[in-house]
């Protein structure tokens, strides 16, 4: 039985926030038509002009918040800016009608004043130790520093997008598992990372595979800026701001290509399709390896992971996955080289016991599961990654609810407050 928690929660939230104001705004155009039409001879022109202005307003309202106000001042102040505009317009109307002038003026002044007040609009209001909380065109951004690490999250409640260990060592997360790719490649001279983040994997490649050249593509310019300021992204890393697939199309060839372009719970559809992975294969050198990070793994039939594995296996003849211990990530290694996985095993065996990669690579080798492939193929024309991502979150919510039900049944509802 499908629960669709996210769908219903999103629908309920949208109804609560937007139904009443949108219904009221929906009455504006018909009312204007009524008041502006003075003659049946001119009504067609009048209605057309109003509709044209409405269309222009819709276009401005769509693009101005996304590309200007939200990146510049954030979501909360964007709401206040547009509320103030509506309030000022209403004030002008009531002044012309000589009605409710004082009341409208007070509302307009209050909303306008709120825009300039130094409020701390924190989405993570329960956190008191955030180094940075910001928004960009693409992401909510949260930087938190601990004694051992600096962490970037693009989700207000959970998840780690990037991490820097102050000790300079391994992270204990999926980045360590992904280091199997440069170890597996015939040579590791050129590495491309699609979804650089703050450069965790890039820094590890330079540290554990000295001499390699690393290029990282990150679509979010603010994340690149954070990587330099807070995460110590090495200057040797060529950080490119742009879309990963667009960059890949015009780039050269590489020994290792990592695809790690998750945006919150989903992967961009254009970086999940059979056409994309075909392009990746074409940009790999002989003996090259692709590694894909799959976040929020699921064992359910028809999950996002299953779609991605089937899609990749339809392009790469040799694929295997490994589960990240203690996390929800699944790493997939893919190559067109028949000797690739045998070479990985040989190189892992050759690592000395005191080698920093020895333990984690042994864990990777033990956990590798070959991918057989199937018929669940994502294409540029059809890649429902958002729905697949929501399905995984629904599974997580259902699991948590079952845990809570069991706790309440066993210990009572007051146990939740302890």
Language-model features: locations:
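Soluble small-group transferase modules, centered on the S-adenosyl donor enzyme superfamily
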Residues: 101-174, 181-184, 321-418
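N-terminal post-signal-peptidase region of extra-cytosolic proteins
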Residues: 176-177, 317
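Alpha-helical transmembrane segments of multi-pass membrane proteins
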Residues: 1-133, 145-147, 157-160, 186-192, ...
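Short beta-strand "acidic-cap" motif of Rossmann-like dinucleotide-binding folds
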Residues: 216
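Short, conserved active-site loop motifs that form the nucleotide-linked donor/cofactor pocket
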Residues: 236-238
């Amino acid at each position: 039985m499908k629960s669709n928690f996210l769908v219903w929660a999103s629908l309920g939230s949208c109804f609560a926030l937007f139904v009443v104001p949108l219904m009221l705004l929906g009455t504006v155009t018909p009312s204007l038509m009524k008041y502006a039409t003075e003659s049946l001879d001119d009504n067609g022109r009048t209605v057309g002009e109003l509709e044209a202005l409405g269309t222009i307003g819709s276009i401005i309202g769509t693009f101005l918040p996304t590309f200007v106000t939200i990146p510049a001042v954030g979501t909360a102040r964007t709401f206040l800016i547009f509320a103030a505009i509506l309030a000022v317009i209403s004030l002008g109307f009531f002044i012309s009608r000589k009605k409710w002038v004082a009341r409208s003026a007070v509302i307009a002044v209050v909303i306008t004043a709120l825009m300039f007040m130094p409020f701390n609009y924190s989405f993570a209001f329960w956190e008191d130790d955030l180094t940075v909380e910001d928004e960009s065109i693409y992401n909510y951004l949260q930087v938190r520093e601990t004694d051992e690490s600096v962490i970037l999250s693009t989700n207000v409640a959970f998840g780690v997008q990037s991490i820097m260990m102050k000790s300079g060592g391994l992270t204990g997360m999926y980045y360590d598992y992904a280091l199997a790719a440069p170890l597996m490649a015939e040579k590791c001279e050129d590495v491309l990372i699609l979804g650089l983040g703050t450069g965790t994997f890039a820094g590890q490649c330079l540290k554990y595979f000295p001499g390699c050249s690393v290029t990282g593509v990150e679509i979010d310019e603010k994340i690149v800026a954070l990587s330099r300021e807070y995460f110590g992204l090495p200057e040797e890393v060529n950080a490119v701001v742009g879309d990963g697939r667009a960059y890949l199309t015009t780039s050269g060839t590489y020994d290792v290509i990592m695809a790690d372009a998750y945006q919150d719970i989903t992967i961009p559809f254009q970086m999940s399709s059979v056409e994309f992975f075909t392009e990746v294969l074409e940009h790999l050198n002989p003996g090259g390896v692709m590694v894909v990070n799959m976040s929020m793994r699921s064992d359910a039939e028809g999950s996002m992971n299953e779609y991605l594995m089937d899609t990749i296996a339809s392009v790469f003849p040799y694929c295997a996955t490994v589960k990240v211990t203690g996390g929800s990530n699944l790493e997939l290694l893919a190559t067109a080289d028949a000797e690739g996985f045998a070479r990985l095993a040989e190189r892992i065996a050759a690592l000395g016991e005191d080698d920093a990669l020895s333990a984690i690579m042994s864990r990777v080798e033990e956990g590798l599961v070959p991918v057989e492939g199937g018929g669940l193929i994502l294409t540029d024309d059809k890649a429902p990654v958002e729905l697949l991502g929501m399905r995984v979150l629904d599974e997580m919510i259902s699991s948590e609810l079952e845990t809570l039900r069991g706790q309440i049944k066993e210990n009572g509802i007051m146990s939740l407050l302890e």
